């Protein structure tokens, strides 16, 4: 989580010392990570691999990190990543290098000779996205690591409200083996309207609509499929009513003008965190996304980082 104090999240967190939240910002693929964090001390090796294709970043333009004590060497940020560089200098940013979806350490010869196990459907963008979100790279995982984590912490919450919430649809990241995820609309939609099921804005219409919907859910309960669908709908109604009762709390907006897609998502997440006591939440996981970033053969032409 980067710069959360600017999003109003710090004030939201401060309500309870026993509250923990994980906010996952998922970048939807295509970014050239090798041109984001660049080895400064071993620049020659980097340049040897990158200069022939014309995508090496000049060493003189890198935003230097200083020597990183844990590895005893220096790196550089891409010259336009000034915001991340500032956070690094303030001690608010950590970089996890050399992570990915490999099943095991793989060499070029091992890949060519098929002696290394490689991710399922390697080079498929959609499969790689799923593998990042499931943390399973050698098979089609049925659940995401966010959802599986939610399975483990749900009992800490004193509510039926889901522990995992997405502002970017229903990605597999949010799917658990036990817990069902919640997907809500983003800001500037009011939080108390982020789950409205019926489209009627005024409370009298909403209330009457729900009375009739509840009656419909009692029909055809002898059929397993209908019974299951009715249970899910009934739970959704309960969650919408719980969220509606919280109102629309005020939080500091994301500091961009005009509004950004990511800022709108983070603002709604900040609102959710701020009403956690009303919802009975102690542990929550949030998912939002940005991108994608595929440049294909235009990376050299574009010249800017992703």
Give the positions of each predicted feature.
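Feature for exported/extracytoplasmic and membrane-associated proteins, marking the mature portion
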Residues: 1-306
């Amino acid at each position: 989580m980067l710069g959360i104090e600017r999003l109003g999240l710090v004030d939201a967190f401060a309500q309870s010392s026993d509250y923990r939240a994980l906010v996952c910002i998922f970048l939807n693929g295509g970014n050239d990570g090798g041109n984001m964090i660049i080895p400064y001390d071993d620049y020659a090796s980097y340049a040897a691999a990158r200069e022939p294709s014309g995508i090496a970043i000049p060493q003189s333009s890198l935003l230097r990190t200083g020597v990183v004590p844990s590895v005893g060497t220096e790196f550089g940020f891409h010259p336009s990543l000034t915001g991340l560089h500032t956070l690094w200098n303030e001690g608010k940013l950590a970089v996890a290098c050399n992570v990915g979806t490999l099943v095991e350490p793989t060499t070029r010869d091992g890949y060519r000779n098929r002696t290394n196990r490689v991710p399922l459907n390697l080079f498929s963008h959609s499969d790689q996205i799923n593998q990042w979100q499931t943390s399973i790279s050698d098979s089609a995982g049925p659940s995401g690591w966010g959802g599986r984590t939610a399975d483990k912490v749900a009992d800490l919450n004193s509510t039926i409200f889901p522990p995992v919430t997405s502002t970017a649809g229903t990605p597999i990241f949010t799917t658990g083996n036990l817990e069902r995820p919640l997907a809500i609309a983003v800001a500037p939609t009011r939080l108390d309207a982020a789950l409205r099921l019926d489209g009627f804005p005024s409370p009298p219409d909403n209330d009457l609509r729900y009375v009739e919907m509840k009656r419909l859910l009692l029909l055809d309960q002898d059929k397993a499929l209908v019974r299951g669908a009715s249970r899910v709908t009934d739970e959704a109604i309960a969650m919408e009513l719980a969220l509606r009762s919280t109102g629309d709390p005020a939080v500091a907006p994301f500091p961009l003008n005009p509004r950004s897609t990511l800022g709108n998502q983070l603002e709604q997440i900040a609102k959710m965190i701020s009403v956690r006591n009303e919802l009975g939440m102690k542990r929550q996981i949030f998912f939002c996304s940005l991108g994608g970033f595929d440049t294909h053969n235009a990376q050299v032409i574009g010249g800017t980082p992703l």
